[in-house]
A protein has these predicted regions:
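Acidic, glycine-rich two-metal-ion catalytic cores of nucleic acid-processing enzymes
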Residues: 2, 18, 24-50, 56-60, ...
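Conserved DEDDh/DEDDy metal-dependent 3′-5′ exonuclease domain
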Residues: 2-10, 16-154, 239
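Helical catalytic core of nucleic-acid polymerases
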Residues: 84-164, 169-179, 183, 209, ...
């Protein structure tokens, strides 16, 4: 059902508040950061099978205002963090997180598209808000395919949900993202990705890797405080990963820099020792 009037909305709300559901947001412009675009439609599939499309910004529909969608039922979505930027709901479980906690891999559904999506994105690649002109039924086709993957994942890995990560970590990252980073040319937005092979979040968007800005070529200079006479303060742990491992195995480092200590063990300089430690941590083994 496409919800386009008060009667249909009332019917939807009644069903939505009585049953767990899959929730998939469709932004107006998928190429923009979620903070910089609006919600075009919201696809909701109840776990019993009923489907609803709520249109807010689409050329084919009678658009409605975003209703109050808070309820006690569970909502499963692919990206809770992204959903937070469009609409804040209670009891939302990130299915990508479920899968990652069980397999150390991320679900890959970004490439799921219909022929219509491919056509519009190639033909009108310069146009903003392309999702508002892609036919609603094609969005429905795409969402059904995504929903099937999400439901299968929930059935298989539901016990792997880590509520601290699901609630606190994802919501805090949403908050950090929506505040953006002040630069000399305005505010830019980043996007955190928890689902890396090492478990160390990455942070990039629009071709910029914010977690690895070069320290020597001036790449960091445009980033400034948003406050008058403000400053940016960077804090870092000395040998954080090495210290975590040492704590786990009961090893005690001496006072001082961990990397300087490891440099002496390796018989190399500080910078090389730091690089070697990370390589050993993440899969490089010494040749015998």
């Amino acid at each position: 059902m496409i919800v386009e009037n008060k009667k249909q909305l009332k019917e939807f709300i009644k069903s939505y508040k009585s049953e767990d559901s899959i929730v998939i947001p469709i932004p107006c412009d998928g190429n923009k950061h979620s903070v910089n675009t609006k919600l075009s439609t919201l696809y909701v599939q109840l776990l019993g099978g009923r489907e609803f499309i709520l249109p807010f910004n689409h050329s084919e529909t009678l658009n409605i205002e975003i209703p109050n969608l808070k309820s006690d039922t569970k909502k499963y979505t692919y990206d809770r963090k992204k959903l937070n930027h469009f609409v804040k709901l209670d009891n939302v479980i990130d299915v990508n997180l479920l899968y990652y906690m069980a397999t150390n891999k991320s679900l890959n559904i970004e490439e799921i598209d219909t022929n219509a999506h491919h056509f519009f994105n190639m033909r009108y690649y310069k146009r903003n808000n392309i999702n508002t002109i892609i036919p609603v039924l094609k969005h429905l086709e795409k969402c059904r395919e995504i929903a099937k993957i999400l439901k299968d994942t929930v059935e298989k890995y539901a016990e792997h949900v880590k509520m601290t990560y699901n609630n606190e970590v994802l919501d805090n990252l949403s908050y950090i993202e929506q505040n953006g980073l002040q630069t000399t040319n305005g505010v830019v937005f980043s996007e955190y990705n928890l689902y890396t092979s090492t478990g160390r979040p990455s942070n990039r968007f629009g071709g910029t890797n914010f977690a690895a800005l070069n320290k020597t070529d001036g790449s960091r200079k445009p980033y400034v405080s948003r406050f008058k006479n403000g400053v940016l303060v960077e804090m870092d742990f000395d040998g954080y990963h090495l210290r975590l491992i040492a704590d786990k195995i009961g090893y005690k480092f001496p006072e001082g820099s961990v990397h300087e200590y490891m440099a002496k063990l390796y018989g190399v300089g500080y910078d090389e020792a730091k690089g070697l430690s990370f390589q050993y941590l993440y899969g490089l083994f010494l040749k015998r």
